[in-house]
């Protein structure tokens, strides 16, 4: 008997600065539909979802609520998981970024990439919007404010670690060109190629404390 082909699917992990919204629900419903469809085709599916529980915005929200950040994310993550279970989504694992096992695996992978030279130390600098948790260049600002939410931004600079995505740009372009079904739908493939890969893929900051 041949081994079942494997299929891995994950959602973005929901941010725990507040209650879940329709966008989170929409995403997991779509992922659940794909997972169920692939199982019906005979695939060995592993479907993962979860919550992102780190960030300055969470710290500020916890302070406003008069509780610790851990207590705050515990409440939000529990509510998100309750809703996913209420909807009978068929995920195989619900990951929390505060889980001991998750932290252990992240450290293991980070060290492996650092030892390999794929992660290096540098500086990240820009105008930072706390509500959006995003950095912007001066040229991206609208009237000196965040282009996404319109709130004031603050200059920020800190030492950080970067992943050498630029090192893999040519390999990614070649793979996408030889496997046109790799990114779907086609509009997203074109967006990735034209907006990120072909102009020159930038290294990714992976350790901001903000």
Regions found by a protein language model. Name each.
Residues 2-49, 101-105, 158-210:
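Structured secondary-structure scaffolds
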Residues 12, 56-62, 89:
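A short small-residue
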Residues 43-44, 67, 89, 118:
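Short glycine/serine/threonine/alanine-rich loop segments
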Residues 47-57, 97-102, 131:
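Short, solvent-exposed turn/loop segments enriched in Gly/Ser/Thr/Pro and often Arg
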Residues 61-74:
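A charged helix-plus-loop insertion that forms the helical arch/lid used to bind
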Residues 72-128:
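A broadly conserved sequence feature marking short terminus-proximal activation segments
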Residues 116-173:
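Cys/His-rich short segments
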């Amino acid at each position: 008997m041949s081994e079942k082909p494997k299929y891995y699917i994950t959602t973005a992990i929901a941010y725990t600065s507040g209650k879940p919204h329709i966008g989170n629900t929409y995403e997991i419903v779509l992922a659940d539909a794909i997972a169920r469809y692939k199982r019906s085709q005979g695939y060995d599916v592993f479907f993962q979802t979860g919550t992102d529980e780190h960030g300055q915005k969470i710290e500020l929200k916890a302070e406003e609520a008069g509780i610790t950040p851990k207590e705050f994310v515990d409440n939000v993550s529990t509510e998100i998981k309750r809703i996913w279970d209420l909807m009978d989504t068929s995920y195989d694992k619900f990951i929390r970024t505060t889980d001991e096992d998750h932290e252990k695996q992240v450290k293991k992978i980070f060290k492996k990439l650092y030892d390999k030279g794929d992660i290096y130390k540098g500086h990240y600098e820009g105008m930072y919007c706390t509500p959006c948790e995003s950095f912007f260049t001066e040229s991206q600002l609208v009237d000196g404010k965040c282009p996404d939410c319109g709130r004031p931004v603050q200059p920020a600079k800190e030492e950080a670690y970067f992943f050498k995505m630029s090192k893999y740009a040519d390999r990614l372009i070649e793979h996408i060109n030889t496997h046109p079904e790799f990114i779907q739908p086609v509009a997203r493939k074109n967006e990735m190629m034209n907006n990120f890969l072909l102009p020159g893929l930038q290294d990714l900051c992976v350790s901001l404390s903000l």
